[in-house]
Amino acid sequence: ITGSNSELLSGEMATLISGRYYQINIYPFSFAEFIQYKKEMEKTDIVDLEELFEEYVEYGGMPPIQQVAAEDKYSYLGDIYNTILLKDIITRHNIRNTDMLNRILDYVIMNIGKNFSAGSIVKYIKHEGRKISKDTILDYLLYAKNACFIYQAQREDIKGKKVLKHNEKYFLVDHGFYQAKYGEMENMEYILENIVFIELLRRGYD
């Protein structure tokens, strides 16, 4: 069974097929996989690593966009984002206030790799003259996590080794979604942190 929605194997489905499946998490191309793909497509072992890294940073590693013309890549990423939003979040959870969901995900995308809390988003929404509860925000974030669109990195007290429940960091399954939305390279440190975080997940770290 495959799909973008992790709930496919987490709730009632996991109960139905208990003991009959092995879950494998599939992520977008790593940089190493991206290089290998380019070599195979161009039928050469000679590549410009610096040039390829710039391309990888700018557009991400989603496999479907690799054969799309450069001028259409952001648009294609936008289509993927809208599909995840519609099928895996809005439709599945019967969300009516889709604009509010969009604003919350915009905030998360804009702040990848930064510490923030549900309270931070409440203030952000309030600044726009609107209201939303922390519980609703936490629900929306959970839906996005279950759709494998975002991943949460909790803070840990190094001395006590306790997980801190406030000001977590969130990362995107693919940094290309940030670039497609904002197209800015000035936040390079956060984009690189996102790349490293997903690579750690890819290697089995939680």
Where are these regions (language model features)?
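Glycine/alanine-rich phosphate-binding loops at beta-alpha junctions
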Residues: 1
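Interdomain motor-coupling "hinge/lid" segment immediately C-terminal to the ATP-binding subdomain
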Residues: 4-6, 10-115
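Accessory nucleic acid-recognition modules appended to NTPase machines
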Residues: 70-206
